[in-house]
Amino acid sequence: VGLFNSLAISLISIYYEGKERDRLIGFENAAAAAATTIFTWLVGYLMSFGWHMTFGVYALGVIPLTMFGLFVSDKTPTVTGASTSTVSTQKPKLNATMIGYGIFMFILFVTYFGMTVKIAPLFEQAGYGTAAEASLISGISAATGFVAGVIFGSIKQILGRYMIGLGTLAGAVMVLVLSMSQNLILSGVAIAVYGLAFGMAVPAIYSAVAAKTDEASQNLGSTILLVAVNMGVFLSPYVFQLIASAFGDTSAVFSMRVDGLLVLALAVITLVTASLQKPERAPKPVHAK
């Protein structure tokens, strides 16, 4: 699965650019959100036939493999200009954009996973919901994440370089709202908006790295981001356990507030950085004399 994700984003970054690349990266995230929801339900159904049957979902990997062979060209994209003679000799290079956004994605997914696993305990400790209701409401974020992926390309054209910061800021506010919520309706709205904001920020990061990376390094860039994502998810429980132990508070509300403040710090740093960047200028038209 990790190889598929990295390759999919790399191919989009190599074969497409600009608005078309943004739109396809959004579609990739939308498809991932939809598949996560559908296959989670499918695995739950297959569990009734025994846990061995749950691994049957991996047989569906034949579908993208077949479609890839039928529809994706095996030809290297045409490169114009002076880079034509050098593209074949270029080697992957690590750049500051990859490192910076890799750290960003690590922290973001530490907080994302930390938030999702604390929803059920939060509902139960606050006394307004059950674990089953928390599971149902959590599914809303996947649905809004799908919507975010579909409309990502259009929103990216409006928000530009502020896309990542504003998406992260909206997510931070929603986590803090969730930590203070006392009813299912407000919690559902907060989770829905969080899914939408998260679904905007993540593809924007992939797009930003692709835009700042040469063709030979596209696969390296997407791989670094995906490794950061997986490490963030893996280490998230340990990070929040360490924080809870340090402050002597193991409640879900405390963890959720720490989560929100961490995401808020990411948002502030990102927005300040974006505001200091010079906007890209469109080339001036050449007038005939």
Q: Could you describe each region identified by the protein language model?
A:
Residues A148-G160, A244:
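Helix-to-loop junctions at the C-terminal end of transmembrane segments
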Residues T54-L70, S255-T273:
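Symmetry-related core transmembrane helices of the 12-TM Major Facilitator Superfamily/SLC fold
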Residues K212-D249:
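A late C-terminal transmembrane helix in Major Facilitator Superfamily
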Residues G160-I205:
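C-terminal transmembrane helical hairpin of 12-TM major facilitator-type secondary transporters
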Residues V1-A31:
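Cytoplasmic helix-loop-helix junction between adjacent transmembrane helices
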Residues T97-G139, G145:
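Extracytoplasmic gate region of multi-pass secondary transporters
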Residues K19, F27-S73:
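Helix-loop-helix hairpin linking two adjacent transmembrane segments in secondary transporters
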Residues F4-Y16, M200-D214:
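Intracellular juxtamembrane helix-capping segments at the cytosolic ends
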